[in-house]
């Protein structure tokens, strides 16, 4: 596996490989990779001749400068994992490489980006679309892989691809969880043992809600989840919504929308 730091060098490598008829898969990440990321990379490797994994902590999607500063950066360990997964390239550019000038583009995909996470983190999804569009333009992948854990982000990226006429396939990949049910996340490294235990109440409540929803109304299910999270130690609920998986708009009945894998962070 090669570690590449500039768009020019990566494009030169990909030009040669495309001339050989190879398809290119892209897995965009911010590093601090774990088994969940590995599942995306392995899927890309199985479906494409070449897999590029970007490792870039994108500053434009952070609302909190402290969160940006504290985000784990583990490039050496990330590269070892990527090599084990069979990736061809780790693309690890600098901020200056990706943003030689400030990106003033405004992406608006309302109502997809104005509800839930969009309401609590204004500007976040605009930053996500900025960097993802830059990666698509630079790499021109045939397929790009995103985890369903960030389900709202996945829906927004699908809409961006549709509106901007990108000629690629967006592949959503299932959530990967610890044995006890906690969804894998790079930020889990920042949790204390007690905070991690508290976080388990999120996935436990969501799995309970899946069964609960089969015999209760949307409002009853909403109330059950809200009360369970508020009663759990160390947790404060920001939002819980039951929505259509494509439009992210609230639904009147959850019977058609119950899923074997509740989406949570």
PLM region descriptions:
Residues 2-235, 242-247:
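Nucleotidyltransferase catalytic core that binds NTPs
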Residues 233-234, 254-256:
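A structural signal for short secondary-structure junctions
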Residues 238-241, 259:
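Conserved active-site loop/cleft motifs that coordinate metal ions or position small ligands
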Residues 257-265:
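Single conserved hydrophobic/aromatic residue that forms the stacking wall/gate
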